[in-house]
Structures are given as C-alpha cells and as structure tokens.
Swiss-Prot record:
Gene3D superfamilies: Cytochrome Bc1 Complex, Chain C. The gene is MT-CYB. CDD domains: cytochrome_b_C, Cytochrome_b_N. This is Cytochrome b. Heme b b562 binds at H83, H182. Keywords: Electron transport, Heme, Iron, Membrane, Metal-binding, Mitochondrion, Mitochondrion inner membrane, Respiratory chain, Transmembrane, Transmembrane helix, Transport, Ubiquinone. Heme b b566 binds at H97, H196.
Length: 379
C-alpha cells in the first residue's frame, strides 16, 4: 500500500514541498530566510488577529484602544510589541532574502523573482498601513505625507488622493479603510507566497555555486527541516529579546503623542525599514521625480534578470562584482541613516550622492563589471 503522505491529495502537496523535496546538498544558511519569512508572516497574522479583536478603527478611540490593549488586555502589551517588532524582523529577513537573491543570481528564476518583487511591494504596503493604525502623531503625518505623494501623478493626482482619503484630509474614513486593507493584505501576501513557492518548486532551488545540482540532491526532511528549525529558534530568540528588553528601540517616540492635525512633528519620518527609499524620495527636489525614484528604487529589482551580463550565475567566483555588491550594501546603510536625518547640509548632498550611487551600481557598474569579468576568464 502506498504511504498516505504520498497518496492523499492534500498531504501529497505538503510532502512534495517540505518532506521529499529534492534539495541541493550545498545550500548555506542564506537559504534559511524563506522559511523564516513564512514564520514571520504566520506570527504577524496571529498577533494581528488578536490585536484586531480589541482595536477600534475610529479617530476618536484608535489611540485609546491601543493603550487599552497594552494596559488592560491579558498579555496585550506582549501581543502589541511582538506585532510591532515582528514587522522589523520581517523586513530584516526580507532584505537578507533579497540580498541573497542578488548575490547568488536567484533572479534567473524569472517567475519566482517577479512574484517576490510583487510580495515585497505588498508587504511594504501592509507595513505602511499598519503604522497608521495606532493614530499617533507619526501615524497621522506619515499617512498624510505618503498618500499625498500620489498627487504628483499628472491630471488625476489630486482626485486620486481625495478618493483614497475619503475626504479632503486624512480622517476617520481613511483610518477605517486602511484598517480594512491592513487586515486583508497579509492573506493576499500568504497566497502570493504560495505561488512564489509553486514557481520555485518548478525549477528547484539555486545553490551557492550557481551550477546545476541535479546530480547531487538530498531530501528536504530531515536535513533542511532541522536547519530551518535552528534558524527559526535563533530568529525567535532575537525577536523576543528585542520585544522584552527594548520594545521601543525601533519605534518613534512621537507616536506616543495622539494624532493632532494642527501640530506638525519636527521631523516626519517612516519606520526604519522604509528610510532608504524615503532618502531616495527626498534627494530629488521635484515631487514627481521623487515619487518615480521612490517606486524605481524597488522596481529596479524586476530588471535584474535583464541586467545580468555575466557568464556565471552567482558572484561566488566574481571578486569585482562582490566588491560592488558590498558597496551597494554600504550605500543602503548610508541611505537608511540619511532618511532619518533632517533635511539640511550636509545630509542633503550625502543623500543625493548615495541615491545616484544606488542606481549607478545596479544599472551601470555591476553589468559592466560582469562583462569585464567575462573577459578576464579568457586570460
């Protein structure tokens, strides 16, 4: 008789994805972040569900309801801070996952990569909407500034912004709809993640060498299940340490002040994981130009398969590309730092130079370096 895990229509899918899946024998810890992102998503959906039970999406009571969750609900403070810091862990894993993809040429799986870029946009949209919900000063002004960017779209911009606001400013209607979207989007993200995996399992995983690994595959279970559990434990340890020892480390103190449309905070800035994109937005003096640069800073990832000029898939054996990759990482750290600084000298010029370098590295320098390395192979 055939084993039930190989015969049952539902269990068969799980078996082929997590148990009998043929996996390259040499994938490193950089391949752990997919499973960590899955755990993050499940954690966010669960904590978010319990928060939604006590949260009210009304401008008069939203701030108070979050305070009520932290003070009066059993372990409400833990659920709230796990959710807030869980978002930070989510983005740390996302950035490392995308970085791995860039370094090891995983973008050559075009469908998987494009769904991944779509997922990145969806998660960023979800996180932005979630930041608005506590209805503190930074929530309100962040929502006002970011939604206002759409007014840069020619002709329809202003109408579009007022349509999204549900009025002539960020108000009750805006908060209610953002809560609705914040609730539904993670489930769309989960569905997209399923499609992401579906396309990945069509081709099989890449590996650090970038060479075909069909001749050397091992079953996912027990080798990589154990490895993923170790990764998950390390991530959960980091998340719990952050949540229990310094829950407000990555937050903004201004968000503990209830939203006040009559009082603008001195520095409006988003959460840390958006600061690099925010710095690129601010580095262009023109509104429409800034918005385009903001979108392109993420959308440029979709061009990676077209910009791949190397004869080798990964950067493992390409020292010049490696140097440029780590320069890109340093540049992103610089942009993140600049995004949190006030708009004044010398931060303006540093931000502009870092933004130019960001696009130059991805669009010009890395493809040229790859061509150079192709020629070096002939020596």
């Amino acid at each position: 008789m055939t084993n039930i895990r190989k015969a049952h229509p539902l269990i068969k899918i799980i078996n082929n994805s997590f148990i009998d899946l043929p996996t390259p024998s040499n994938i490193s810890s950089w391949w752990n972040f997919g499973s960590l992102l899955g755990i993050c998503l499940i954690l966010q959906i669960l904590t978010g569900l319990f928060l939604a039970m006590h949260y009210t999406s009304d401008t008069m009571t939203a701030f108070s309801s979050v305070t009520h969750i932290c003070r009066d609900v059993n372990y409400g403070w833990l659920i709230r801070y796990m959710h807030a810091n869980g978002a930070s862990m989510f983005f740390i894993c996302l950035f490392l996952h995308v970085g791995r993809g860039l370094y090891y040429g995983s973008y050559m799986f075009k469908e998987t990569w494009n769904i991944g870029v779509l997922l990145l946009f969806a998660v960023m949209a979800t996180a932005f909407m979630g930041y608005v919900l506590p209805w503190g000063q930074m929530s309100f002004w962040g929502a006002t500034v970011i939604t206002n960017l759409l007014s840069a779209i020619p002709y329809i911009g202003t109408d579009l912004v007022e349509w999204i606001w549900g009025g002539f400013s960020v108000d009750k209607a805006t908060l209610t709809r953002l809560f609705a979207f914040h609730f539904i989007l993670p489930f769309i993200v989960a569905a997209l993640a399923g499609v992401h995996l579906l396309f990945l399992h069509e081709t099989g995983s890449n590996n650090p060498s970038g060479l075909p690994s069909d001749s050397d595959k091992i079953p996912f279970h027990p080798y990589y299940t154990i490895k993923d559990i170790l990764g998950a434990l390390i991530m959960l340890l980091a998340l719990l340490s952050l949540t229990l020892f310094s829950p407000d480390l990555l937050g903004d103190p201004d968000n503990y002040i209830p939203a006040n449309p009559l009082n603008t905070p001195p520095h409006i800035k988003p959460e840390w994981y958006f600061l690099f994109a925010y710095a690129i937005l601010r580095s262009i003096p023109n509104k429409l130009g800034g918005v385009l640069a903001l979108v392109l800073s993420i959308l440029v990832l979709a061009l990676m398969p077209l910009l791949h000029t190397s004869k080798q898939r990964t950067m493992m054996f390409r020292p010049i590309s490696q140097c440029l990759f780590w320069l890109l990482v340093a540049d992103l750290f610089t942009l993140t730092w600049i995004g949190g600084q006030p708009v004044e000298h010398p931060f303006i010029i540093i931000g502009q130079l870092a933004s130019i370098l960001y696009f130059a590295l991805i669009l010009v320098l890395m493809p040229i370096a790859s061509l150079l390395e192709n020629n070096l192979l002939k020596w």
